[in-house]
């Protein structure tokens, strides 16, 4: 069993995989050192981070990862292996020589002694309009020039010191576009350059704890007043317009003799003379379906005589819309209903039954003219 034991890998064999942690040959170590650090060094091995003597003299950030300044223990696979950069997170000094270009995401690498210094490096939670209002409100005469506003922002908020072009343009745009800031020309006896900017007294209520409301309060007041005026107008116009809207409906309801133009809910019940017409129509339809042939002439219902001749011709059988009938009292054979018949022979217009009240349709089911009932298959 001992013949199968493999020897441990030698350090030179690991050099291609881990060239930056001190396992490369001397010539490779010198190559990396000369590439990243042009200055000459006496030996390839330097003191570790704990000494701290040569860290501040090399501002190159590549030194942390590829340079020989960090000499951690060799990388050995196993549960007790040392981390790749064990001492980089224990440094008690800034890792970069200058902190002027750091953003908010890099603040975790810096030793911040107090919260005041931290607030100097982050953006203040105020809009540009609020900054302008604070600057003007803090002035003795309640007015400032553009350069004085710049100076106030830069002195009180060091965050804006690193880049002046962007926020200064925003200050100018807010002064020009916001109605709360008024331009006041200089007096003739006042030497200097540029006009003064003041704050409109009506806009002081638009600032809540230094934050500008962006005209929300004023717009809401205007919208509420306009809405109340519109409501008053509609209320005043309702008594005048309501009779006009109800009169045409009354005229339509009264003009329809049989309730043909109005809805079934508003129609009065039809006269009882319509029932014999419907019974005669249904009896003739039953006789036609049970005894007639599909090739016979179309069905004509002479029972619908109260209508004029032209109306009777329209209501007899228009063959436009399909509204079949079932549950006929005289129907006895279900096999005749299953016979294929032309739809234009059995279908009829919905205007025939529109003359009658809906309670007549309770005994009329229109699902069996072309389709057989259940249990009547031949």
Swiss-Prot record:
It is found in: Nucleus. Keywords: Activator, DNA-binding, Nucleus, Transcription, Transcription regulation. GO terms for molecular function: DNA binding, bending; DNA-binding transcription activator activity, RNA polymerase II-specific; DNA-binding transcription factor activity; DNA-binding transcription factor activity, RNA polymerase II-specific; RNA polymerase II cis-regulatory region sequence-specific DNA binding; sequence-specific DNA binding; sequence-specific double-stranded DNA binding; transcription cis-regulatory region binding. One of its GO terms (cellular component) is nucleolus. Residues 236-248 have a biased composition (Polar residues). InterPro entries: Fork_head_dom, FOX_domain-containing, TF_fork_head_CS_1, TF_fork_head_CS_2, WH-like_DNA-bd_sf, WH_DNA-bd_sf. Residues 1-26, 208-278 are annotated as: Disordered. One of its GO terms (biological process) is positive regulation of transcription by RNA polymerase II. Expressed in kidney. The keyword Transmembrane does not apply. SMART domains: FH. Residues 123-217 bind DNA. Pfam families: Forkhead (PF00250). Transcriptional activator required for the development of normal hearing, sense of balance and kidney function. Required for the expression of SLC26A4/PDS, JAG1 and COCH in a subset of epithelial cells and the development of the endolymphatic system in the inner ear. Also required for the expression of SLC4A1/AE1, SLC4A9/AE4, ATP6V1B1 and the differentiation of intercalated cells in the epithelium of distal renal tubules. This is Forkhead box protein I1. It comes from Homo sapiens.
């Amino acid at each position: 069993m001992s013949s199968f034991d493999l020897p441990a890998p030698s350090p030179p064999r690991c050099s291609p995989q881990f060239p930056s942690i001190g396992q490369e040959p001397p010539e490779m170590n010198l190559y990396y050192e000369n590439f990243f650090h042009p200055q000459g060094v006496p030996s390839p091995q330097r003191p570790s981070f704990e000494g701290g003597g040569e860290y501040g003299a090399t501002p190159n950030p590549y030194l942390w990862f590829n340079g020989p300044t960090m000499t951690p223990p060799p990388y050995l696979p196993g549960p007790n292996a040392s981390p790749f950069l064990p001492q980089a997170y224990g440094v008690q000094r800034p890792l970069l020589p200058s902190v002027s270009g750091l953003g908010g995401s890099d603040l975790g690498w810096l030793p911040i002694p107090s919260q005041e210094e931290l607030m100097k490096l982050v953006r203040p939670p105020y809009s540009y309009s609020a900054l302008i209002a604070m600057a003007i409100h803090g002035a003795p005469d309640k007015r400032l020039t553009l350069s004085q506003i710049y100076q106030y922002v830069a002195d009180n908020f060091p965050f804006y010191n690193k880049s002046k072009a962007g926020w200064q343009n925003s200050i100018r745009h807010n002064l020009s576009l916001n109605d709360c800031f008024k331009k006041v020309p200089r007096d003739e006896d006042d030497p200097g350059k540029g006009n003064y900017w003041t704050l409109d007294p009506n806009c002081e209520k638009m600032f809540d704890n230094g934050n500008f409301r962006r005209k929300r309060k004023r717009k809401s007041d205007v919208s509420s007043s306009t809405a109340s005026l519109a409501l008053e107008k509609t209320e005043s116009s309702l008594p005048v317009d309501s009779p006009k809207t109800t009169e045409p409906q009354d005229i339509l309801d009264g003009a329809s003799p049989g309730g043909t133009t109005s809805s079934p809910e508003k129609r009065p019940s039809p006269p009882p003379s319509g029932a014999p017409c419907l019974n005669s129509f249904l009896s003739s339809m039953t006789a036609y379906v049970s005894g007639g042939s599909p090739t016979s002439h179309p069905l004509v219902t002479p029972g619908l005589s109260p209508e004029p001749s032209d109306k009777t011709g329209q209501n007899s059988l228009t063959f436009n819309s399909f509204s079949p009938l079932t549950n006929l009292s005289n129907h006895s054979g279900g096999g005749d209903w299953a016979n294929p018949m032309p739809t234009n022979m059995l279908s009829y217009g919905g205007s025939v039954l529109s003359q009658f009240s809906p309670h007549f349709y309770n005994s009329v089911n229109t699902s069996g003219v072309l389709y057989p009932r259940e249990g009547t298959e031949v």
